[in-house]
Amino acid sequence: MTTSSLGASEGAARLAHKVRSIGHLDLAGAGQVTVAGRYAYVGHIPNTAHLGTTIIDIANPASPHVVAEITLDDPTSHSHKVRVAGDIMIVNHERNPTAIGRRADELPGAVAELTARHGRAPTHAELALRLGIEQDAVGEVERAAARGYHMGGFKVWDVSKPASPRQIVHHKTGGIGVHRFDMDRHFAYISTEMAGYVGNILVIYDLANPAQPTEVSRWWIPGQHIAGGEKPGWAGRQHRLHHALRYGDEMWASCWNGGFSIIDIADIKRPRTVGCHNYHPLFPEPTHSIMPVPEKLRGRRIALAIDEEDQAQSADEEHDRRGRVHACLLTFDVTDPAAIEPLGQFHVSELDSPFARTPGARFGAHQYCERMTGTIVHAAWFSGGLRVIDVADPLAPREVGWYIPEPVAGRPAPQTNDVALDDRGLIYLVDRHVGFDIVEFTG
């Protein structure tokens, strides 16, 4: 295990090391950035301007400029994830706010359970305790349940002219809709809720006709298919697909508190699990992403998992978490998928960011650039900014650079949420609240 730390003798944490700033925009908060050619595509966290997606010309990285903005046509949804392949862009459509939507789905069962227990209708205080929410949020949950939600899915866009994107279709799925996903020129690998399942599963769609995505196959964690008679061995949606990434004839599926799975899709109509590993609850934060290192290291096949630092919901919870392991990067030997072995970890010390204990801000890992060359990983670390990590020794990953954006728009701390690279080696960062940065690793 390695830990990034400047040490007390070096004083306050420096904001950058071997990474230099090139360009910046005070862009609305975002969930994902993807780069294709001379354009960056940004999927937004819910915002007052109702932005769904922004397209940015990055031909001159020192002077990026917005060429198109797509606003949401549905106030009950958000569209914070985006991918591009060729002239096709896909964005997610997911219930907003997600947490309220999930509690709305649970409300009828909670009411029935409490009514049977007490012989009367439950109070808001009882419902709040049962649903794990604040009492003043129960009314919002009740209203959301009364409205229902039928807009979940994904939208396909023609971006052959990036300054003039054209919607092709809104393909609806089920439940609260689609979260993160992967795609290429032929298929979309969608993480979505579907009728009859608990939590997100993988649904693969053929994009031969972008106006009519056609389902090819499904994959899920055993126990999710409740309509098929399966029974989950966990509470709620704790074991579910976060998203799955395609590498060759495999899908690498991050399964939240269920760890990760490796799926053989040589026959894409029949996905087949060939390996799985769950390192929770030893590590308390859920698995956000899993990917294989593109080359063997020391003759072994290596995979990298990155966990997502969960959001503390109160000052008391923030205090209670002190001393708990933050979300981190983990390495695994996956040479034999049937016998996966943990190898190493990489952590960032709270000493390495002046914003690590900013009230209300997250500090810990979230996401990495999901396509890597060589052994360098670029990871988003919330108030720890960007961390550049070399995994050449998977037993002891080491930090080789970092960049912590200065907070903007009056925010007390950066919340670096997502990172992508272009074919020039430039690095693109988005912040959950405000900020789009272009930086370069100089190491």
Model-derived segments and their meaning:
Residues 124:
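Helix-turn-helix DNA-binding elements, focusing on the entry/boundary residues of the two helices
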Residues 128:
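The alpha-helix within a helix-turn-helix
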